[in-house]
UniProtKB/Swiss-Prot annotation:
GO terms for biological process: NAD biosynthetic process. PROSITE patterns: CN_HYDROLASE. L-glutamine binds at S175, K181. The active site is at E45, K113, C149. Gene3D superfamilies: Carbon-nitrogen hydrolase, HUPs. This is Glutamine-dependent NAD(+) synthetase. It comes from Rhodobacter capsulatus (Rhodopseudomonas capsulata). ATP binds at G290, L291, S292, G293, G294, I295, D296, S297, T397. The keyword Cell membrane does not apply. SUPFAM superfamilies: Adenine nucleotide alpha hydrolases-like, Carbon-nitrogen hydrolase. Keywords: ATP-binding, Hydrolase, Ligase, NAD, Nucleotide-binding. The lineage of its organism: Bacteria, Pseudomonadati, Pseudomonadota, Alphaproteobacteria, Rhodobacterales. Residues 5-245 form the CN hydrolase domain. It catalyses: deamido-NAD(+) + L-glutamine + ATP + H2O = L-glutamate + AMP + diphosphate + NAD(+) + H(+).
């Protein structure tokens, strides 16, 4: 008779610190697995606490509560399958990132994370102790090896588990999204399968946490490297995977394969889910934003409507004497197509009042960016008042290009609690708007069709803080600016390297200077979803005071 083993993969969305709620989700998955005849129900890395916890796991009281919650969960796991779930483990030897296996009312095994990532968004070397490579776990007919997340990115752990008799690799993860990550995971895990000859189940969590998105997209590889099962990206899923022992090895029975979305859709889904979860997990259900008639605020409004429904999106137009009729018309047109509320609050009176109050202080000076920024800051004051009064989170709308070079006003258009575009360059803003106009998915809560007026996409970008202003008065064309920024930020290239690629040296050096002198602004900027390898927060940590410039 052929040996069989059923694993329920629970690709779910935990909340950091919500121990009881996360345990309840785990038990619901366990009950679903029990009803389906599973032998093991698996949840992702650090699921009980949520992930990433950052310094929360350095707090003894939190670790105490997490350990108590795990013990209480174990007591419930009776008369059914084993439950594998991530959570911290503390003993006299240290504090570990562990994957616990619970069965028959007790803890039957733990796999401790061996390789602690200390790059990009991770600082696990300061949070956890390095665990030894755990022995394979025997569950019924199968010997299960458990490399925890980063462990699968190195050949030694999987190799040691295979040498110790593991027959299947179960990899629980908290692997955050960035562009290209889905393909990279397949390459890395495919290498582990090729090295060991073992099938591999890759289980990732899903959901937003602060600036990070966990995109799910879990999968199962057979010993020949073929994909047997592929779970959806960016949504919860509970899937039952059947393993069968053949003459030579265990193999997964092929089942549903959900094709991953394309690059633009992945980024867009990340922005929508990031906003959705940041609000939900923070206790908000509505947003407010300044709708200028420009492309950035238009895209943020649509992202918000797709995440929350248009009825929970409050748009506010805040015109001054410099606001064009075209911008007024475009903002109204977008709100109408979206079905969102639009209010208009004039700022000309407040602007005149502030400038009048400052007249004796500024006497003898020529108007400059100071007066322009008063307009932006007045808008921030008004929007924050609406946010406070109605309990709606204020969204800020600056794209990565603007945030990179400081083309934004601190305490003005930077005011807000979350920025969906923080890691999206301006050229990609245009691409994303065109894509959204041509695309609709069942998970989008806003209407289908050409929801962003073409006039908004086609007109030259402008802050409209003075007569006849365009962004290109102060910046190179966005195609040039973004190409230079990607080389400086994501590529860490030198000035010489960028010039060798065909860019003007003076322009490159100016952009480099703007990037460095804007660090203090970014330090005070709202969080936003990480889409690239170098988002402006944990990925890229530069000093605010920095006199060095590349002289190459």
């Amino acid at each position: 008779m052929t040996d069989r083993f059923r694993i329920t993969l629970a690709q779910l969305n935990p909340t950091v610190g919500a121990l009881a709620a996360n345990a309840e989700k785990a038990m619901a998955a366990w009950q679903a697995g029990r009803a389906a005849g599973a032998d093991l129900v698996a949840l992702p890395e650090m699921f009980l606490t949520g992930y990433q916890t950052q310094d929360l796991v350095l707090k003894p009281a939190f670790l105490r509560d997490a350990m108590a919650a795990m013990a209480a969960l174990a007591a419930q796991v009776v008369d059914g399958p084993a439950l594998g779930i991530g959570g911290p483990y503390v003993d006299e030897t240290g504090s570990y990132n562990a994957w616990w296996v619970l069965k028959d009312g007790r803890v039957i095994a733990r796999a401790l994370k061996h390789h602690l990532p200390h790059d990009d968004v991770f600082d696990e070397m300061r949070l956890f102790d390095q665990g030894p490579v755990s022995d394979p776990l025997r569950l019924g007919p199968v010997a299960l090896g458990v490399p925890v997340c980063e462990d699968a990115w190195h050949p030694d752990v999987a190799g040691a588990l295979a040498a110790a008799g593991a027959e299947v690799l179960m990899v629980p993860n908290g692997s955050p999204y960035r562009r290209g990550k889905l393909d990279l995971r397949r390459q890395v895990t495919g290498a582990r399968v090729a090295e060991t000859g073992l099938p591999l189940l890759y289980l990732n969590m899903v959901g937003g946490q602060d600036d990070q998105l966990f995109d799910g997209a879990s999968f199962v590889l057979n010993p020949d490297g073929s994909v047997a099962v592929q779970l959806p990206a960016f949504e919860e899923a509970v899937v039952h995977v059947d393993l069968e022992r053949g003459a030579a090895d265990w193999r997964a029975v092929p089942a549903d394969i959900v094709a991953p979305p394309g690059d633009i859709e992945q980024d867009y889904r990340a922005m929508v889910l990031g906003l959705q979860d940041y609000l939900r997990k923070s206790g908000f259900s509505r947003v407010v934003l300044g709708l200028s008639g420009g492309i950035d605020s238009a895209l943020v409004a649509v992202i918000a409507a797709d995440a929350l429904g248009a009825g929970n999106v409050h748009c506010v137009m805040l015109p001054s004497r410099y606001t064009s009729q075209g911008s007024l018309d475009d903002a109204a047109d977008l709100a109408r197509r979206l079905g969102a509320r639009l209010d208009t609050v004039e700022i000309e009176g407040p602007r005149a009042a502030v400038e009048g109050a400052l007249a004796h202080v500024l006497a003898g000076t020529a108007p400059d960016v100071t007066e322009e920024n008063i307009q932006s800051r007045l808008r921030g004051v008004i929007l924050m008042a609406i946010s406070n009064k109605f309990g709606a989170m204020l969204l800020t709308t600056g794209n990565k290009s603007e945030v990179a070079v400081g083309y934004c006003t601190i305490y003005g258009d930077m005011a807000g609690g979350y920025n969906p575009l923080k890691d999206l360059y301006k050229t990609r803003v245009f691409e994303t708007c065109r894509w959204r106009n041509a695309t609709h998915r069942p998970w989008m809560q806003a209407p289908a069709g050409e929801i962003i007026p073409v006039a908004i996409i086609d007109k030259p970008p402008s802050a409209e803080l003075r007569e006849n202003q365009t962004d290109q008065d102060s910046l190179p064309p966005y195609e040039v600016l973004d190409a230079i920024l990607e080389r400086l930020v994501e590529g860490d290239q030198s000035v010489d390297q960028i010039v060798a690629a065909g860019f003007d040296r003076a322009t490159v050096k100016r952009i480099e200077h703007l990037l460095y002198i804007s660090e203090w602004k970014r330090f005070q900027s709202a969080p936003g979803p990480r889409l690239t390898t170098r988002a402006f927060w944990l990925d890229r940590r530069y000093p605010m005071v920095n006199r060095w410039r590349d002289q190459s």
